[in-house]
């Protein structure tokens, strides 16, 4: 049977498809219809294609068998697709994820609301779980736990979950599913070496030396240098031997790797802008209201001195293993979108979330 190939090459700050979120919406629609969908992570040079008879190189994409039902979904989503008689064996088979979205006391609405929008516009399904749900062991019915940002470095999670909830999360990651945490959610699995901090899970060999001093840095726009350009979360983001991403930072952890079960995928490199002169952005942030809030409406502005002292060279994005499952930890906020390079809804930064979820689904 013929194969369909959905290219997803990086083209500047966008991709070769018309819409980043729209393409993932179609991919999830295919998965939800039971279509076998594979992620082709390695680049392929074709001698000829229907669109490029002289031959063409594609960086990455998605593979499925040709069918009328699949074509209907692809056509309805206006997704560009190539047809081939045969293709190299793809890297991973993708599966629908049953996501537990934490919305207990530790989930700050200003951080969880944009993450909900990012998931919805790409057709990722999820269910909210409360502190009570977690404490009662209901995480066992899910494939992964997604923890959004919080207003502090972890104590708010403990205020709702307590020891029982923390033990349920540890057991879930060890025995049942994966974990993705953003900002405060990236603090939660860290290990503290201070007796007065019972608010982290202590399940990965990474820490923040400032411990619970959530307000030690501030908010601003940062450039993160990608350490592992071949990691799947950077698919359609990293290209060539050196790549970076520009993201909103809002008091996230400066992670320091302390052991072998965690590795840095990207590190803080440059402070681009903040709400303090002379670093106030001189460009239009368009419809990205969260980026505006991080710069104009937050009292604690990230300064060059604080960036150098607290963040420069520290781990910004990490991957960890805990027993049989994986954790992805994002200190900056990919769900807050771009820094004024285009419409918020088409932010390339969302790929850290979309790719991350697909990566976890394939494990």
Tell where the protein language model's regions lie, with residue ranges.
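Intrinsic-disorder/low-complexity accessory segments
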Residues: 1-136, 141-169, 173, 178, ...
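A residue-level signal for beta-strand positions that form part of recognition/binding surfaces
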Residues: 3, 61, 98, 200, ...
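Well-ordered beta-strand positions enriched in small/hydrophobic/aromatic, beta-favoring residues
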Residues: 14, 99, 145, 201, ...
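Short, surface-exposed amphipathic charged segments that create phosphate/polyanion-binding patches used
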Residues: 55, 143-145, 216-223, 279-285
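Residues that flank catalytic or metal-binding motifs in active/ligand-binding sites
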Residues: 58-60, 95, 184, 197, ...
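Short catalytic/ligand-binding loop motif for oxyanion handling, primarily in non-cytosolic enzymes
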Residues: 154, 188-191, 212, 273-274, ...
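A glycine-rich, often tryptophan-bearing local segment used as a flexible ligand/cofactor-contacting loop or short
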Residues: 157-246
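Catalytic beta-strand/loop cores that center a nucleophilic Ser/Cys/Thr
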Residues: 222-326, 331, 335
